[in-house]
Amino acid sequence: MRVETYIPGLSKNTVDIVKHAEALGYDALVSGELNNEPFLPVLMGLEHSQMIVRTGLAIAFPRSPMTVANMGWDLQSFGDGRFQLGLGTQVKGHNERRFSVPWSPPAPRMREYILAVKAIWNTWKTGEKLDFQGEHYTHTLMTPMFTPPPMECDLPPIYVSGLGPGMARIAGEVADGLLLHPMCSPQYIHEVIIPAVAEGAKKSERSPDECELLWGGFIATGETEEDLQAAKRAIAARISFYASTRTYRPALEFHGWEDINEALHKLSIEGKWEEMFALVTDEMVDTLGFTGTGKEVAHALKDNLGPICSAVMWNEVEHLGVDHSKDEHVAGLIEIVK
């Protein structure tokens, strides 16, 4: 099982972060899209390491499939086959009010988006005429002037982020992997996600094993009880943010926490962010995440997720590239998980 870590947005410290992560034994770097652009850190990761580097995730709908296809092609060529394209939808409000793009049912639209990117790549790789015509995206023009140089390696794998069975089915049907949302507990993965991926794979007449599951959930570690409780409180704050969103309600309903979803949503509308994490119970933290000493968590990740996931994300060093005080300890934990 690969062990991955998160690379923050591009900064003057990015090269140090990349080199530190590789020295610790991480297999992959993941660049997200919060208050930063997700593709620029990927370039730095590919240039200054031999690790896999993935967008995890880049928000799809504000970007044309052509733009993303071009970016993915260039990064995969530059990194000699070490780039992975991770895409996500974000929620309706952010698409409409932050990115100013129209919203439509996300799962079928993401399916079409992935197929559009693959069609563009196929044209560049084979020379076949570009003729993709869907409900949301149409790509029918490609001339030699705008065709990128040949790629010597395989096409980049495409991963899609998802929480519900709808997106899991899409991943199983057309993607190379599913980036599991942090609100997916191990039980939810077994009972909801894996059957949905298998259903999607059956539609494409392929094995479910062709769609990897990548876990990036909640982890709280502490070598003392005081440190562990502080880490669990930090997780509770993150859970309260996700659990206040109605889009993520299915994962909460699965565990019987729908009332907490309603209460958190109400507090979020009122802007009472500081009060929200108090509603997150220890049961929620322990069910959704992995908690304990570093070694306890490492073994739990390996035992619980190793049989079903190809990779886990573990950001055990808070300040990569700066804090080397726990290098030997963290390297040992990474080795256990693998």
Indicate where each model-derived feature is located:
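Active-site-adjacent structural elements that line small-molecule/cofactor binding pockets in enzymes
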Residues: 1-338
